[in-house]
Amino acid sequence: MAEITAALVKELRETTGAGMMDCKKALSETNGDLEAAIDWLRKKGLSAAAKKSGRVAAEGLVGVASAPQTAAMVEVNAETDFVARNELFQAFVTETARVALTVGEDVEAIKAAPYPGTERTVAEQLTHLVATIGENMNIRRARVLSVPQGVVASYIHSPVKPGLGKIGVLVAVESASEISALETLGRQVGMQVAAANPHSLDTDNVDPAALEREKAVLTEQARASGKPEAIIEKMVEGRIRKYYEEVVLLEQVWVHDGESRVKAIVKNAGAKLTGFARFQLGEGVEKGPESDFAAEVAAAAGLA
């Protein structure tokens, strides 16, 4: 049996909000498997958390750049927020996003590409910047979206400068409609993605493993009610619909009015969403408490 360490118990407590003894029991029952322990607690009704809290650890900036029918987004990390406010660093993030527009989203290809206005590559310019500022930096990831007709809109939450911030979103909108209207729609959808953090564009693209895991947890929760299997099945179906409303962009409630569905808004605009990307600075690495981005975006949309 795996050793149940204090650190493991602490991590499970922070992730789920469950009590120490419940966390110890969950880890014992699941042989120290953290993910399985989270599910065990949820099945017992002892966890309010449906997923790990993606705490933010890295500093730096997310940057976007656009061209007709395409857009790129990069995340460049630094050690401190002080560097993120440095104009040289900000310029590097902006130029790196522009390079990604040309060479694509492969980070190694971006690093090997010429850095605009110099005889250096992007990687060499980064090394030069590290030596100049005296702090380690890294191009963490990049994403490029394109459409054959329409726009790829971008949205930066609370930008420190145009195209630079800590949360960035790209939204691919296909349509023959007027470009300015599509850009407005795309920006509104971008705010939706920033606030609601969907995992999938539509129900067909939901991770099958994640869906089966959710069904298993919901079924166990429903069975705890003691109701007949036929009723349990209906309960699970309803809860899966609710799950889709949380994780699927097109099924979500439109944050701008609190009533409509995203899919209805897009359809009424005569458009089709073909993809989206969301970068949150340092996503997936734990740190201290972060601000409520959903509330901030709602405020920016005039709904708070």
Curated annotation (Swiss-Prot):
It is found in: Cytoplasm. One of its GO terms (cellular component) is cytoplasm. InterPro entries: EF-Ts_dimer_sf, Transl_elong_EFTs/EF1B, Transl_elong_EFTs/EF1B_dimer, Transl_elong_Ts_CS, UBA-like_sf. Signal peptide: none annotated. GO terms for molecular function: translation elongation factor activity. Gene3D superfamilies: 1.10.286.20, DNA helicase RuvA subunit, C-terminal domain, Elongation factor Ts, dimerisation domain. It holds the Pfam family EF_TS. The keyword Protein biosynthesis applies. Residues 80-83 are annotated as: Involved in Mg(2+) ion dislocation from EF-Tu. Its main location: cytoplasm. SUPFAM superfamilies: Elongation factor Ts (EF-Ts), dimerisation domain, UBA-like. The keyword Protein biosynthesis applies. Keywords: Cytoplasm, Elongation factor, Protein biosynthesis. PANTHER family: ELONGATION FACTOR TS, ELONGATION FACTOR TS, MITOCHONDRIAL. Belongs to the EF-Ts family. Associates with the EF-Tu.GDP complex and induces the exchange of GDP to GTP. It remains bound to the aminoacyl-tRNA.EF-Tu.GTP complex up to the GTP hydrolysis stage on the ribosome. This is Elongation factor Ts. It comes from Granulibacter bethesdensis (strain ATCC BAA-1260 / CGDNIH1).
